[in-house]
Structure formats: structure tokens, C-alpha cells
Amino acid sequence: MVHPFNRIFGKSDKENIDTDEVEYSTDEVIQIKVDNIHPNRYQPRTIFQEEKIKELAQTIHTHGMIQPIVVRKLEDEDTYELIAGERRWRAVQHLGWEQVSAIIRDMTDTETASVALIENLQREELTVIEEAIAYSKLLELHSLTQEALAQRLGKNQSTVANKLRLLKLPEEVQTALLDKAISERHARALIKLKQEDQQIAVLHEILEKGLNVKQTEDRIAQINEPKEKKKPKPKFKGVNKDIRIAMNTIRQSLNMVSDTGVEVESDEKELDDYYQITIKIPKKNQ
């Protein structure tokens, strides 16, 4: 079975890194000291629920470990880094095991990181911030555009873009999102505020007053309203129907582009002999 890692990043059969095969490999299973294993430095998941680990530990205690963990050897003698199976490794630590069954794989940093990121994304157990970080790392590791990554992961480009935009928020907002103190929709609403101090101030209002998403959006609109009033769109009075249709079509197209996550800036002016629309699109998605 070809793992999505290979379909996504175009690995040949020779370079095949099939994480399903990794889990069920027929290669020799050896015993490695639990204390000699380090967690995957590229692991996007930052929160491991203690209760879930305890439940897994009880299952392993009762039935044994059915699947070995997968590791790669580090430069230090007898030291290994996890590739797959961190929850199982944490569970046997909880049980106080001295050794654990493992398979050793020879993988580069890029391969190790990609396997960890893809596996976690597919299991859909990440928080939105962890998911955003995973997308960001994959973009960097493989020099992909947001559109290319979205296509290879089978997701909408707007989904990837919207998640990545969350990483622009202040650390305090990201922490609140990571801790599930606010929802993703709350966080996406805060992006509409351009000043970091405003974002943090509204975050405090959300937490202190228990604002729902609609109340948060209304509060943000209230803050942005004075700025928006300074730049009213021309009404194009006295123009024929065809020109009005053309102008509205352009506006709708710009809204569609914005919905994909691309930050488009536009300015409309009515001059003596013509109407001018200036559009600015960043060369790189921020």
C-alpha cells in the first residue's frame, strides 16, 4: 500500500517511506532501553492527554504491545529518536518498562519530520494551532506554495491559508486557542484587527465577558468602523448598467480571492474620464 507521504512528496519506490509499512514492517524487532529514546523533535502535537496515555498503558499492560515503535539512530551511541509511536512510548514510560520493542529505520531529518507531520494531520487529533504549525513546517521542508500543499493533502487552499493566518496572531491569543479558551472562529475574527494590542484587548474581553463569536465580530466591527468610514466606496452615480455590472463583478471577484486567504488590497476612484480600481496582491502569502 502506497502511503500518502509518497503521493504527496513524489518519493520513488527506492525512496519509499511508507509509514503504514513502518508500523507493520517485517524487519527485525529489537529491544531498546526506554530511557535511550528521545521524542520526535518535529512532533507537531504539543498536548498529550494524560488520561488517554493511562488508558493506552492499561491496554498494553493487559494485552502487550502489538506494534513496535519506530525509531532512527542518532549520532550519540545507543541513542534513538522516535519516528512513529510516541503515545506508545509514553505509555510504557508510565508503566515503568525498562525496554520497548522497536524497529530502526534510516531516515533523514526531512523524511522524519514529514512522516510525523503527515501522520498527525491524517489522524485529525491536532489542535488548530498545531495543525497550522504542521502546515508551516511542510511548506518550509518541501518549498511548496500553499496551493500546492493543499492539493497534495486533498484540502481546500482556503483551509490551509486560514489555518496559517492564525500563526500571525500574538502568542497570548495562540495560547488561548491552544488551550481551547477560545474557538477558531473567535481567533479568525481577531485577525481582522490589525494592531496586536487591539487583538489582545479584545481577547481579554472575550475571556472576561464570555463573548460568543457574533458578539466578538460585532465588537471588532465597532473598533474598525471609524477607519472604514474614511474610505467609502464610490457610488458611481449616473453610470450605465453595463459599467455598474462590470464594477460589481470585479468587487465580487476580489471577495472570492480574499476568501481563499490571500490578503488583497483594493482602492476605487472616480475620475473625470474613467473609473480607476487599484489592486494589490502580495507576491507571497503571509
Swiss-Prot record:
Q: Where do transmembrane segments lie in this chain? A: none
Q: Has keyword Cytoplasm?
A: yes
Positions in coiled-coil regions: none
Report one GO cellular component.
Answer: cytoplasm
Which keywords does this Swiss-Prot/TrEMBL entry list? Answer: Cell cycle, Cell division, Cytoplasm, DNA-binding, Septation
Task: Report the SMART domains cross-referenced here.
Answer: ParB
Whereabouts does the entry annotate DNA binding, in residue ranges? 147-166
Kindly indicate whether the keyword Phosphoprotein belongs to this entry. Answer: no
GO MF terms on file?
Answer: DNA binding
The entry's localization annotation reads: Cytoplasm, Nucleoid
**Functional summary from the UniProt entry:** Effects nucleoid occlusion by binding relatively nonspecifically to DNA and preventing the assembly of the division machinery in the vicinity of the nucleoid, especially under conditions that disturb the cell cycle. It helps to coordinate cell division and chromosome segregation by preventing the formation of the Z ring through the nucleoid, which would cause chromosome breakage.
Q: Which family does it belong to?
A: Belongs to the ParB family.
Q: Which NCBIfam families match?
A: nucleoid_noc, parB_part
| Protein known as | Nucleoid occlusion protein
